Amino acid sequence: MNNFIVFEGICCSGKTTTCNLLSKKINEIGEYKAIYNHGAMTYTDLGKKFKENLGKKDMPITVSYFFTDLIINTKNIIKPYLTDKHIIVLQDRYFDAITTYIKAYGDYIKTDYNIYDIPKALVKNDILINPSLNVFCIPPFKIIKERMAKSKESPVHDFYRDNPDFFKIVYNELVNKANESKENIIIDTSSDLSVEQGINKILEAIKK
């Protein structure tokens, strides 16, 4: 069963809203229970510190915080949930969101920050989990920029607003990652039709 569904996307891409819509649909059907779990930058003390440091500290420190936070969350939260075959975990960010961010930052400063091999190795060694399904929330960049301009103050959002060229590079890197596999579901969250079609595809995948 496809019970570990990961939603990836840049800030203000509509991940959380889409997760909530899907969660409601799953719970209405009644066969499974949907559990929402926030991935990168979790609600733990370490996750909160990671969020504060993102965009402020250099990338080696950022990467260390990220993988430590994600490994702990996988061990203590995700894996226990997945032992129950009646639970579907809707993961709001896993590893693609941050690895694309790091890679994009390297491109921005013209340095090789490609760390895509790290999560692959962690999945291979059963430390992280390979998602049953990857869902990328990617509305047009213009829409995300408009949403970001109205969004709350935070270290991550402020860094994007202060560095619009970097913001676009991150967006493009996520688009590239989304298009790597035909199995990925891409949702334009600015379109009600695209959201509806994407959710229906996910519901079909859950049944397999």
Set out the residue ranges of the language-model regions.
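Post-Walker A helix-loop "phosphate-sensing" segment adjacent to the P-loop in P-loop NTPases
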Residues: K24-A34
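NTP-dependent small-molecule kinase module
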Residues: S23-K25, K142-K208
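Hydrophobic anchor at the beta1->P-loop junction of P-loop NTPases
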Residues: F7
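ATP-dependent small-molecule kinase phosphotransfer cores
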Residues: N37-D117
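A glycine- and Lys/Arg-enriched "phosphate-lid" helix/loop adjacent to the NTP-binding pocket
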Residues: I98-E173
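Walker A/P-loop
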Residues: T16
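ATP-binding Walker
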Residues: C12-S13
